[in-house]
Amino acid sequence: MSVYGLQRLYIGGGYVDATSGKTFDTFDPATGDLLAQVQQASAADVDRAIASAQEGQREWAAMTAMQRSRILRRAVELLRERNDELAALETRDTGKPIAETLAVDIVTGADVIEYYAGLATAIEGLQVPLRADSFVYTRREPLGVCAGIGAWNYPIQIACWKTAPALAAGNAMVFKPSEVTPLSALKLAEIYTEAGVPAGVFNVVQGDGSVGALLTGHPDIAKVSFTGGVETGKKVMSLAGASSLKEVTMELGGKSPLIVFDDADLDRAADIAVTANFFSSGQVCTNGTRVFVHRSIKDAFTQKVLERVKRIRVGKPTDADTNFGPLVSAAQLDKVLGFIESGKAEGAKLLAGGTRLTEGHFANGQYVAPTVFGDCRDDMKIVREEIFGPVMSILEFESEDEVIARANDTHYGLAAGVVTENLSRAHRTIHRLEAGICWINTWGESPAEMPVGGYKQSGVGRENGITTLEHYTRIKSVQVELGRYNPVF
């Protein structure tokens, strides 16, 4: 018997049964326990969700911006009131430590909704004078029905990130969470309904990539916001364009460089590197997995990193003291272990971890020890490809120009960071790095006010920040003639 029972679709302000007759299972990655059976959406269900969203969107867009703002603020209040309950669910579904989900996942998701609730009333057009008796004005109008496709590493946070600007601008959204972590998006739907969001404005359809493809290719979807891998992102972009030239926002993979210069505070640098590789068991798209360290300090830096890795508390995610949990699934565990074996085979020096943890309460979970490789080269698979797990690669460098060139030698461009006491060098280096999200002497924070997204094959568009709100609107230009019309013929 499952912990949470049968999970249905959420369409039109309530739960409905899928018509496919199919279900899939979701498991607790720490214990292997069956959490729920989830109904898979059919093409007819996707059509129903979009039709419901169209109806709800008309009502939602007809409200004043202040009315929408108040409703979204109420949703924020409900999220914060239920933080502990939602964090417990997210921990069971993802395997993240409860200390992490309590402090980050729902908290930051609510912050983003609050941010856009505040901006809803600031959506404005322009007035452009042409001459004494004629002018142009513009309106920013909602796109209509948007699709959100989430990833498995931050299920409820991603759902908040995608819905907040869309709803603030007067759109509706049909959201498909990852089939690996499908539970918390349904709770967000309940909260939106309770807060007063009209029925249909936020619908949740469940299923695998085929359901995402139905959304992406649907002619009545105006925009797709996708978070996931590069190859899937390319398919999303292709289908979105081929179907109806719909707009896309995509936050894709990364293989981000962290550069530690020779004047860095080594304790600070080691703390940053460990956070940038092992937070959330390394399952973060912006992880700084390519750690470039100046040759003169590499040994001392490496020692400090290893000291900190020994202090990581791997354990049951539900224990308050745990700060490192399992990987999200058996498939992800196999993938990460495969990369570790590749690192060994290509000559990287294993300095810590490198094994699956199977003793005691780890036996049925998807645990891999925090792993550090030294003596890495740029051409190694573990250095070039996204692992999405707790595997750090340490590389040495000698000059600023050299490390910048090597850091940029990738088709990814999501994030980058530098650690140095020389702020001139910090800014100079950051300005030359080909990455959309950069940090100086820190790592990982992505507040609501900060636009996040990638360069190159790490994404298209941005999430969070004022710019994102604008991209959930379309501009209508209107010329007004107050004087005499001069006919052409």
Swiss-Prot record:
What are the binding positions for K(+) 2 in this chain? L245, K456, G459
Q: Which UniProt keywords apply?
A: Metal-binding, NAD, NADP, Oxidation, Oxidoreductase, Potassium
One MF annotation (Gene Ontology) recorded for this entry: betaine-aldehyde dehydrogenase (NAD+) activity
Q: Where do the annotations place K(+) 1 binding?
A: T26, D93, V180
Q: Which GO terms describe its biological process?
A: glycine betaine biosynthetic process from choline
Q: How is the cofactor bound?
A: Binds 2 potassium ions per subunit.
Q: Which InterPro entries match?
A: Ald_DH/histidinol_DH, Ald_DH_C, Ald_DH_CS_CYS, Ald_DH_CS_GLU, Ald_DH_N, Aldehyde_DH_dom, BADH
- PANTHER family found in the cross-reference section: ALDEHYDE DEHYDROGENASE-RELATED
Q: Quaternary structure?
A: Dimer of dimers.
Q: Name it.
A: Betaine aldehyde dehydrogenase
